């Protein structure tokens, strides 16, 4: 009797682990994110909750990855760790060649501001500021000169096809346009990773497709994009889909394979 073939996801994970190095060693520079056996547990109501149970994830520079899973799968916990908003209970997390899993809160904040551009479900725009001023905001905090701020913010808005709406305030923009302003704001510091948490959660299906086209365009330009979602139809836009279940990676497939399975009702 022939041995059962290994699932594609396990083979891919094993290959990634082989090239991303051993514990304690910095991964190859091609890898922008490497987690090694990370766990996260916390106490809730006197019980220990194991949100992540040893996750090995490696993301190359310029990849477009969706992290998907149902409520309670651990995807939000993993997003918080990737975004340097939290630290693992055990294991290693390397971001752009730096081991960030044991950094102080101040050091984490610096890494977060420099390396990660966040896009959230809520747009979090200043209502009385123009699109350009909203995108400039992270550069104000970073002490960048006014001229340079305007140049970089204008470029970021052009990248999301909003060059003609720079002087408009949020209430003069559609929901999709507001989310594009938020994406431009996330891009303005030239982050290593664009980290999007349920970016279409407040949008209708047509506008969601519009935002997915923006992410696809950014990925085609070489931007590393990680998108967290519970919606298979949204995850299917990514080039790679990682599915979490019960705190572990249940599958790790190319977007093409995921779309094929989705079409078959799996």
Predicted regions located by residue number:
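Conserved beta-strand-loop-alpha-helix hinge in the C-terminal portion
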Residues: 248-266
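Pre-NBD coupling/linker segments of ABC/ABC-like ATPases
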Residues: 2-29
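ABC family nucleotide-binding domain
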Residues: 29-249
């Amino acid at each position: 009797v022939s041995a059962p073939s290994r699932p594609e996801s396990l083979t891919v994970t094993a290959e990634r682990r082989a090239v991303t190095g051993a514990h304690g060693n910095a991964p190859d520079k091609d890898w922008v994110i490497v987690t090694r056996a990370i766990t996260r547990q916390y106490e809730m109501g006197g019980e220990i909750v194991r949100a992540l149970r040893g996750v090995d994830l490696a993301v190359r520079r310029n990849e477009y990855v969706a992290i998907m899973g149902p409520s309670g799968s651990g995807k939000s916990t993993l997003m918080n760790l990737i975004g340097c908003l939290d630290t693992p209970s055990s294991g290693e997390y390397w971001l752009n060649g730096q081991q960030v899993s044991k950094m102080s809160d101040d050091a984490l904040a610096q890494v977060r501001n420099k390396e990660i551009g966040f896009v959230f479900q809520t747009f979090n725009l200043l209502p009385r500021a123009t699109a350009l001023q909203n995108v400039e905001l992270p550069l104000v905090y970073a002490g960048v000169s006014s001229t340079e701020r305007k140049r970089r913010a204008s470029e970021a808005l052009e990248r999301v096809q909003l060059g003609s709406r720079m002087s408009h305030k949020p209430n003069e923009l559609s929901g999709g346009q507001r989310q594009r302003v938020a994406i431009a704001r996330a891009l303005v510091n030239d982050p290593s990773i664009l980290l999007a948490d349920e970016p279409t959660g407040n949008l209708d299906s047509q506008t969601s497709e519009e935002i997915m086209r923006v992410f696809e365009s950014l990925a085609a330009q070489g931007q590393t994009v990680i998108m967290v979602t519970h919606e298979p139809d949204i995850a299917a836009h990514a080039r790679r889909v990682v599915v979490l279940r019960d705190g572990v990676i249940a599958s790790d497939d190319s977007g093409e394979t995921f779309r094929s399975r989705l079409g078959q009702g799996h």
